[in-house]
């Protein structure tokens, strides 16, 4: 078994000083521009272990939600899990393999050689502007696109209250113009009914809950039946999370048909680790997948399905493409959109909508736009260019 450290999701790796042979992995991380730091495990109790980890993260300038902890110590595993660290890797150096997952390790390895580091991505600040590149022979020219959009942070500004989100000015009109020229799809983490109502445009694809549920332009409904089996478990998890987190000011637990999203944008920063730890523990207890986003941590059915697989499914269900295959363009802002960026493939176009909530993180995108307003402008200009190709 191997595990991958992904610079899109992880800003730093914290190594237990008791680990053997860390040098090769540290070099790989440095080449990928992932920070590294060490902490001493053993002794001092649970609170001291938490303090050692958080101080180590502070030294490298990373928040726990974007840090990996690698340790051979079960107590440090428990401390990392209770502090909301993004990924906790146990290393079995002493034949205590069962103790590490029991204390909350996401995975247990025999050796650090089993750790992989994703390489080759650029950082958001390094990406060329998609509007400036649009239509240039040496830039962004796609005569037969299928265009996919995230909603929050892409077609809509991120707002404190998710219920208040609306498409940015001009976005729906631009989508309508584009849909007259090529296939258009909205892929959102919101419920299907929610996102389709907020956009309100007929004749396009809508995918809710990261693709567990879709409607085609003709209104045909599709859902992932394996995911539907988890609906009662998600309902129970939502109720339990409301009980556990309801006393923390600024936390909102959103129960969706195929997920439970815990929003902490309005919560105190010193409570975020606690919030994440509670959600991760619920996911581990109930056999649910834990994913993260912009100021949100979410439980989903533990099924190998995401926006990238949804994009490929939609492409496969578009009209016959044997004469000239459609080229996917995907626009998104969040870490869950990276799956779709990967899925567009070498012939597709991935466009990141920039923000600073995760710093200047790595991304698989090829181009960037500065805001949802620029997304609307890009969409309108793309529609106009396609109409002239007729």
From Swiss-Prot:
The active site is at 150 (nucleophile). Pathway: Glycan biosynthesis; trehalose biosynthesis. One of its GO terms (biological process) is trehalose biosynthetic process. Its EC number is 3.1.3.12. The keyword Oxidoreductase does not apply. Transmembrane segments: none annotated. It catalyses: alpha,alpha-trehalose 6-phosphate + H2O = alpha,alpha-trehalose + phosphate. The keyword Membrane does not apply. Substrate binds at residues 150-152. InterPro entries: HAD-like_sf (IPR036412), HAD-SF_hydro_IIB (IPR006379), HAD_sf (IPR023214), OTSB-like (IPR044651), Trehalose_PPase (IPR003337). Keywords: Hydrolase, Magnesium, Metal-binding. Signal peptide: none annotated. It comes from the Bacteria. Removes the phosphate from trehalose 6-phosphate to produce free trehalose. Belongs to the trehalose phosphatase family. This is Trehalose-phosphate phosphatase. It comes from Mycobacterium marinum (strain ATCC BAA-535 / M). The lineage of its organism: Bacteria, Bacillati, Actinomycetota, Actinomycetes, Mycobacteriales.
